[in-house]
């Protein structure tokens, strides 16, 4: 049983949804019209033993991550967070002080990103902690960026540096400490001279998430290994074998960076520059969908490798 | 560690929420303004071994209940469901066929109540199933009914019959098979001659949920044991001791009926009548908060018992 198979079953059944569903399942956020407003919604689970290790992580960082990874979805739509509701299922022996620290961290993180927690549900059981965060967002006049829309010839760009998000470097562990790219996503979506054709956040690894973009847009992509911006964590992992650098940059999950495609002329305005705190790198090009693999990698020696689904399917791991 | 203590910590911290949070934590649904719309949101968890027993329940009924118990919150606000997102954490050995049946049941139930599932998240782990359903609703011109607003002299009313929701009677098991009181809640909220002063849905048992209403409204309530509408399930449980009838009607959880208070003149229009498929019963009266227990029960012999917190705290059981 693979989570992607289950998800695709849900997406396939999106046919026949009522008109008020503006963005059906399959994007970083879904959207529904309520009154005159388009309301974007995403839901993410943070499970002890799956997405986080409570034995090895401070409770404050767990609470923080529960919110920031949901906000990464909002960033990917170029939208603004409006509020969140949080459900928690806690082991009975979790401890009240620890529970309070957890909720304080969740609330403070959410407020810091202007995303107040305005509802929730708490249950207790004899199994590991599971947090479920639902975030609501609005476009406030800017159309959300979807996964579909990439066109042949588009530059494939990413923010920040990729790979090795689990590796602590000088006290910073990216998958716990990252800043969701809300300001960058918003600036890209709002800026006519740079507005991407499509966008996604990198949670499963560039190989897999770029493949999602390609499939949604019915195109393919070629990535240049030499152009990948590699994180310090990935450098640490590949210290004994630099040829592994691109594997970590393409395959590791939980970068929580943005990946987008943009026309070549727009790309010229932003590639190599900082957009609201994040440096944009061009890593490849959108090519025609010829029925082959969605994502291909051009290695330094010029050979081209198919790399669909190299990414880390972290939710089901 | 009690879930109510944790919840009250979250509610207390609602002070200082931004203006766009219309309904802070503590009601059946919270609400936030997005654009020009007020968006109501509730989140509920359905955990195997806590809220449902997967070994003893068909997967279709599990999927159904995940949606209907969330819709009961919408009914309690007198609002209209707009859509839902569903997060599922499934044991790795759950089985694909069973997972598909579960999602089909969730989707079909949601669609039947005009509440399309437009997003979700799936994870897998080595622990029991946990479903988390977030429902969005709108007022569509009708102000939502809150828990606060009960006034001294109000009639305390309920819909349907109470207690014994776990007991199968002629193939009907209320906690699995109930219809959320969406049409009744809406008719009450929308009807000026009958609009309640406050409303809640009965998930933790009348004693506890009425106490929530009283605390939110800073009043108390007196309930007449003789006036309680008792379900067939509760009758079955109290067959050997009819004095236990009121205990089941007041204390058992998961009725998913509506409890509301309404001025005496408005009550005359609806008590003993059917409102959109649900018979309304008057079970008591709102009295002043004199610092004593929030809810008191007048027994058939005229004695009065305090019964705060008799209800079933099902989420933490």
Annotate each PLM feature.
Chain A
Residues 37, 140-145, 267:
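Short helix-loop capping/hinge motifs at secondary-structure junctions, enriched
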Residues 22-24, 32-35, 110, 123-128, ...:
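Solvent-exposed alpha-helices and their adjacent loops that cap or buttress functional pockets
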Residues 1-15, 92-118, 124-131, 136, ...:
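Glycine-/charge-enriched secondary-structure boundary and capping motifs
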């Amino acid at each position: 049983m693979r989570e992607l198979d289950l998800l695709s079953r849900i997406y396939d059944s999106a046919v026949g949804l009522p008109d008020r569903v503006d963005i059906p399942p399959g994007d970083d956020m879904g959207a529904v019209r309520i009154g005159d407003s388009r309301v974007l919604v995403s839901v993410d689970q943070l499970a002890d033993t799956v997405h986080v290790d409570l034995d090895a992580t401070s409770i404050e960082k767990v609470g923080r991550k529960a919110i920031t990874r949901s906000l990464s979805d909002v960033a990917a739509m170029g939208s603004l967070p409006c509020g969140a509701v949080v459900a928690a299922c806690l082991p009975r022996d979790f401890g009240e002080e620890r529970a309070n620290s957890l909720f304080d961290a969740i609330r403070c993180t959410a407020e810091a990103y202007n995303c107040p927690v305005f509802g929730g549900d708490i249950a207790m059981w004899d199994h590991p902690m599971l947090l479920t965060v639902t975030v609501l967002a609005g476009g406030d006049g800017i159309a959300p960026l979807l996964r579909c829309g990439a066109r042949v010839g588009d530059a494939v760009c990413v923010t920040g540096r990729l790979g090795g998000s689990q590796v602590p470097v000088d006290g910073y562990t990216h998958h716990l400490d990252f800043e969701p790219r809300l300001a960058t996503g918003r600036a890209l979506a709002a800026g006519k001279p740079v507005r991407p054709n499509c966008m996604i956040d990198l949670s499963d690894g560039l190989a897999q998430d770029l493949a999602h973009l390609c499939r949604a847009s019915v195109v393919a992509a070629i990535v240049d290994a030499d152009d990948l911006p590699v994180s310090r964590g990935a450098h640490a992992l590949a210290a004994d074998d630099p040829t592994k650098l691109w594997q970590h940059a393409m395959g590791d999950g939980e970068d929580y960076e943005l990946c987008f495609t943009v026309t070549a002329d727009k790309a010229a305005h932003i590639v190599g520059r900082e957009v609201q705190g994040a440096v944009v790198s061009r890593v490849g090009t959108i090519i025609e969908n010829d029925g082959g693999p969605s994502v291909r990698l051009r290695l330094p020696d010029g050979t081209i490798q198919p790399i669909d689904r190299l990414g880390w399917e972290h939710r089901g791991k």
